C-alpha cells in the first residue's frame, strides 16, 4: 500500500541525507551530457556549412562568413565556460541571443535563411532544464527576432543569400536549433526520470523502515478513515479491521466516543493522545498518539502498553502499601514508646530511692546494682525518647512548642547533663558562648535535644584525651550552633548516609554505641525550624557539625566579658560553661561538606 501524498512528502524530507542504496544520485545514471554534445554538434555543423559555402557558386561575401562566426561564438564560449552559476548562465544566454539575432540580420533578417537562429537562446535554455532559464531564453529570442525584423524593414540588413547557399544556411539553422530543442527535451526527461527514480527509492526505503517499526503507524483522513497502515499491529488490532472499519471501529464500544473526540481534537489543536481497549482484545490497553500533517489528514502511532500499565498499577499499589506500612510502623513505635516509658519511669524512680537509701542502709553490692539499674534505665529512656520523637516526626504528629528564650540557657543545660559523661570518657568539653543574650523564638526542648545529640555523638567517637567544643553565636537573624570534636572522623562513603534514620557510620563496634537516630533527629528538628544541618569531616581529623536556625530575634546584646566559671557538679545551680576562644572554623582544605536532604 502506497503512503498518502502528504505523508510521503513529509517523511521523504527525513531521507534527503540517506546514503545508497536508498538514494541513487542522478550522476550515476547520467551518461554523455546532451548539452555538451549539442554545443559540439553546433560547432561541427557551422564548420561543415562554411566548407559547403566554399564550393557554392556564390559564397555570399563577408556577411555570410560574419553570420557563421556570430553563430559559432556562443557555442565555443559555452564549451569554455562550463560553470553552472546563475550569473554565468544568464550571460551565456545573452551571448546566444546576440549571436543568433546577428546571424539572422546578416543573412536577410527574419525572412532570411538563418532566421531560425533567433531561437538559439531558447534551445540553449532548454538544455539547462530550468523553467526560469527557459523563460529568460524565450524573452531574449523575442527581442532578437524583433531586432532582426526591424533591421529588415528599415532596409539596413544585407541582401539574403540565394540559391544553394541559402539552402545550406537555412538547413544549418533549422538542424542546429532543432537539435538544441531536442537535446533540452532529452535532458529534461532524463533528469525527471532520475528524480522519479530517487523519489521511488526513498518511498521504498520509507515503506521498508515503517514496515519494520515495533509499533503500528497509520494515516487517518477525516473522522477516522484509515488510508495507510505500516508496522507491527498491537495485540487486539488488525490491519484489515483498521482499513475496513476505521480507527473508531477498532476500539471497544465503550471507548469509541473518547476516540472520536480525540480525532476531532487532533484536527483542531494539531495533536492528541489517549489510551483505549481494542475491540478484539478488551483485556489489552493500546496507546494512540496522533498529529496533524495536513488539513483533514492525521498520522498516528498505535502501541501496546498493557505490560507498562500493569507495571504502573503494581508500582502504585506497592507505593500505597509502603506508605501504609510506614505510617503503621510510625504509629506502632509512637504507641509502644509511650507505653514503655510508663513502667520505665517507675523503675527509674525506685532505683533513685534505692540509691538514696531512703529505707535504710544497703550493702555496697546492692548499691552498685541500684546504680547500674539507674544508668541502664536512663540509657533506655534516652533511646525511647529518640524513637518516640522520630516516630512522631515521621507520622507528622510532632508539633513545635515555640517560645522566646535565651538560647545560651538551653546550650548550658545540655552541657551540664553531659559533663559527667565527658569526665568519664576523659574528653575535655568546652563551651564558647557570647557574653550577650541570644534571644530566639524556637522550641526550647528541641534546641536542647539538638545540643544533647550532637555533643553525645561527639563524646562517643572522641578518644580519651580528645576535645569537644560547643560554639553558639548569631548573625543576620540566624542562630548557629557548632559542635566540633577531635575524634576519629567520618569517611566520604559514610557521609552520604548520615542524617537518615537508623543510619550509622564507622565499623560494627562504633555502630553498637547508638541507634542511628541522633543526627536524624537533629536534622529533623532543624528542618522543622526552617534551618539546616551541615556536616564537615575528614577521616582521622575530627568532625564539625553546624546547625543553622533562622530563629534569632535580635542582635546579640553586648556585655562586659566575665572570667570563665569553673564547672560544678550536675546537682549544683546552673553555672555558665567555660568560655574559650573558638576553634578554627575549618578542618583544612580537604574538608568534606555535606548537607542532608
UniProtKB/Swiss-Prot annotation:
Region Disordered: start-end pairs: 561-597
Membrane topology reported for the UniProt record: Multi-pass membrane protein
EC number annotated for this UniProt entry: 2.7.13.3
A Pfam family matched in the record: HATPase_c
GO biological process: cell differentiation; cell division; phosphorelay signal transduction system
CDD domains, alphabetized: HATPase_EvgS-ArcB-TorS-like, HisKA
Role noted for this protein: Kinase required for the regulation of cell division and differentiation. Is part of a signal transduction pathway, activating PleD by phosphorylation.
Protein name in UniProt: Histidine protein kinase DivJ
Species of origin: Caulobacter vibrioides (strain ATCC 19089 / CIP 103742 / CB 15) (Caulobacter crescentus)
Source lineage: Bacteria, Pseudomonadati, Pseudomonadota, Alphaproteobacteria, Caulobacterales
